[in-house]
Amino acid sequence: MKQIFNKLKWTGKKAYFWYVSRGGAGGEEVASTDDVVEVGSEGLVIRVGSQERYIPYHRIVEIRLESGEVLLNRRK
């Protein structure tokens, strides 16, 4: 998954990703590649308002390009 986010970062393509969140409606939240501060080996750091949040890759359930193309879907 790190490779997907690195490719998006270097190509400048915008994508949205959904991740499991204890505080999110329906147990999920969505963020965009514009929110990504750091692409790490085990997860991402994203900016949420004035704070940063760490999202482990195993909590990401879907990645979709702005065009609608699905890059990853791990929903049951």
Curated annotation (Swiss-Prot):
Stated family: Belongs to the UPF0248 family.
HAMAP family: UPF0248 (MF_01245)
Protein name: UPF0248 protein PAE2518
Organism: Pyrobaculum aerophilum (strain ATCC 51768 / DSM 7523 / JCM 9630 / CIP 104966 / NBRC 100827 / IM2)
